[in-house]
């Protein structure tokens, strides 16, 4: 836990359907819950399926996970009109005022989806190798402007004819100095780097002694 109470860090997680957003949330919660006070908000259009899956995984106690039904285009609820998610954040922080981190998972969307700065302090965008080697060079705000890009499911590269070297090279070209991580989240490969990024960029890590 942070020794000095700061406002909860809000981490937005976006990406296309099936890229691994819910898996990332599960792994992050399990990796960080012993050190930090965590809550999570999931977005789906017509159901609360991601909330159910995250709860069943045991990532956090059920009361610390809230599902939001956006009822429309997923990116609208995190960007143009984020009021439904801002209200969800307020409700969770009223329930858990000592929370260190609020994870906000968007509904699956296209490469143009981004989080409103009012809603998210840090943004993580997840794509997956199965979507094709060309995905990083297609660009879009999620790929070029997110604070951290995750290229997930690296284990599938041989099966879909994708070159991880090409994907990494294209990610560097599209993102400049912005970081990215190659991951196989099912096996937790690359997870430590994501946790370190959140701790360092979100100023969660305890300062060094002395």
UniProtKB/Swiss-Prot annotation:
Localization: Cytoplasm
GO molecular function (one): nickel cation binding
Chief site of localization: cytoplasm
GO annotations of cellular component type: cytoplasm
InterPro entries for this protein: CobW/HypB/UreG_nucleotide-bd (IPR003495), P-loop_NTPase (IPR027417), UreG (IPR004400)
This protein's record includes keyword Cytoplasm: yes
UniProt keyword list: Chaperone, Cytoplasm, GTP-binding, Nickel insertion, Nucleotide-binding
NCBIfam families: ureG (TIGR00101)
HAMAP family, per the entry: UreG (MF_01389)
Similarity remark: Belongs to the SIMIBI class G3E GTPase family. UreG subfamily.
Function: Facilitates the functional incorporation of the urease nickel metallocenter. This process requires GTP hydrolysis, probably effectuated by UreG.
Subunit description: Homodimer. UreD, UreF and UreG form a complex that acts as a GTP-hydrolysis-dependent molecular chaperone, activating the urease apoprotein by helping to assemble the nickel containing metallocenter of UreC. The UreE protein probably delivers the nickel.
This protein's name: Urease accessory protein UreG
Originating species: Ralstonia nicotianae (strain ATCC BAA-1114 / GMI1000) (Ralstonia solanacearum)
